[in-house]
């Protein structure tokens, strides 16, 4: 009797398992965000044609726009009158904190400082690359770093790196929201 009950429960578990796997959120962000609320619907990436930054963030914003072009092959016009991506400087509770909202009309990014804006763009880039350039899910993300020091060390004294390799690696660190690069240059 125990054998039949065991087989029945195993069969039931295997029957239900695929539904639970496919029903999970398939949005993968590194590092995991503090909170994400999914909404019904999507935003077509083709609608992302323009962006607006606060004036004091224009230089950093232009670098982020070039990253959109380079990594996601997405060209956007900067500081248009009716932007589809709107970056706002707002007062936040903590440094590097941001809010990213994807609506049917466009994207709203709120950050208290430029670092928060950079982290929001890293999240947006991960969403765009994960969507294979088609549709972004409607959602609201609130995020901030859990640790103030997030970094890696490269031992350049034993394993040599070219300047170009270090520049590429530094861009990857920013993409994953790391803020410290320790270069170990000599042993003495």
Which stretches of residues belong to each language-model region?
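Short, acidic/polar
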Residues: 161-173
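Bacterial N-terminal signal peptides that target proteins for export
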Residues: 1-9
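Catalytic alpha/beta active-site cores
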Residues: 150, 170, 182-184
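Acidic, contiguous N-terminal accessory segments
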Residues: 12-13, 20-150
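Aromatic-lined carbohydrate-binding/catalytic grooves of carbohydrate-active enzymes
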Residues: 176-188
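The substrate-binding groove and active-site-proximal loops of carbohydrate-active enzymes
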Residues: 111, 150-163
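Solvent-exposed loop/turn segments at secondary-structure junctions
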Residues: 114-116, 159, 187-188
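Alpha-helical scaffold elements within enzyme catalytic domains, especially in hydrolases
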Residues: 67, 172-175
């Amino acid at each position: 009797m125990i054998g039949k009950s065991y087989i029945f429960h195993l069969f039931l578990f295997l029957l239900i398992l695929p539904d639970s796997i496919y029903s999970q959120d398939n949005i993968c962000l590194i590092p995991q965000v503090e909170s994400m609320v999914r909404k019904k619907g999507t935003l077509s990436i083709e609608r992302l044609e323009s962006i607006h930054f606060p004036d004091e963030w224009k230089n950093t914003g232009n670098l982020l726009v070039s990253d959109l072009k380079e990594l996601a092959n997405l060209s956007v016009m900067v500081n248009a009158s009716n932007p589809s991506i709107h970056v706002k400087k707002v007062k936040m509770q903590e440094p590097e904190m941001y809010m990213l909202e994807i609506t049917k009309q466009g994207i709203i990014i709120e950050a208290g400082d430029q670092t928060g804006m950079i982290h929001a763009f890293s999240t947006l880039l991960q969403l765009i690359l994960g969507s294979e350039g088609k549709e972004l899910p409607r959602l609201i993300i609130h995020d901030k770093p859990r640790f103030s020091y997030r970094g890696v060390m490269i031992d350049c004294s034993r394993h040599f790196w070219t300047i170009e390799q270090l520049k590429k690696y530094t861009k990857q660190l920013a993409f994953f929201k790391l803020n410290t690069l320790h270069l170990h240059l000599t042993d003495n």
